[in-house]
């Protein structure tokens, strides 16, 4: 069983912002596998389904980004999911737009949502899909809560689809295979 968590902030004002990339990827997976994310529990919205023979729980925390660990730990404990089977999808400023990076473990890299998850799980050993949003020329908060330009949106839509495939690959083939397949790929207009 896998817990697939997309990080983001709830509310219409955050829809399609850089910081909500995790929510967008989870929505793509939900659509592909006909999973309705319409249940409220674990301080978030979630739905259950399958990818092949694997049961998956799709979770969108409603705690706001910096407290995402509260939602993740509740769902992981309820379903008794191993940390190695918790996949977290989130935006990453240290990666260029058009790229993603799959990792099996690691530090928060300055991302407060991941930092909070690491604190609550008491571990940094969980797979993640880091979706590049590029470096800001402006205030970081304004940047991550801002929306992509039209040109960037074209690239991001393709990266979101690739990120969903990377998550599915982790479930079906394992982290190493997903890393080999998706790390280093760059999407351009």
Swiss-Prot record:
Q: Where is this site: Discriminates between blocked and unblocked aminoacyl-tRNA?
A: 9
The record's principal subcellular location, in a coarse class, is: cytoplasm
Q: Does the keyword Nucleotide-binding apply?
A: no
Give the EC class as a word. Answer: hydrolase
Instruction: List the Gene Ontology MF annotations in alphabetical order.
Output: peptidyl-tRNA hydrolase activity; tRNA binding
> What's its EC?
3.1.1.29
Query: What are the entry keywords?
Result: Cytoplasm, Hydrolase, RNA-binding, tRNA-binding
Q: Which InterPro entries match?
A: Pept_tRNA_hydro, Pept_tRNA_hydro_CS, Pept_tRNA_hydro_sf
CDD domains linked to this entry: PTH (cd00462)
Q: Where is the active site?
A: 19
Q: Where is this site: Stabilizes the basic form of H active site to accept a proton?
A: 91
Catalyses: an N-acyl-L-alpha-aminoacyl-tRNA + H2O = an N-acyl-L-amino acid + a tRNA + H(+)
Q: Name one GO biological process term.
A: rescue of stalled ribosome
Q: Which residues bind tRNA?
A: 14, 64, 66, 112
> Which subcellular locations apply to this protein?
Cytoplasm
Q: Name one GO cellular component term.
A: cytoplasm
> Could you give the subunit structure recorded for this chain?
Monomer.
Q: What does this protein do?
A: Hydrolyzes ribosome-free peptidyl-tRNAs (with 1 or more amino acids incorporated), which drop off the ribosome during protein synthesis, or as a result of ribosome stalling.
What protein family does this chain belong to?
Belongs to the PTH family.
Question: What is the protein's given name?
Answer: Peptidyl-tRNA hydrolase
Q: Which organism is it from?
A: Clostridium botulinum (strain Langeland / NCTC 10281 / Type F)
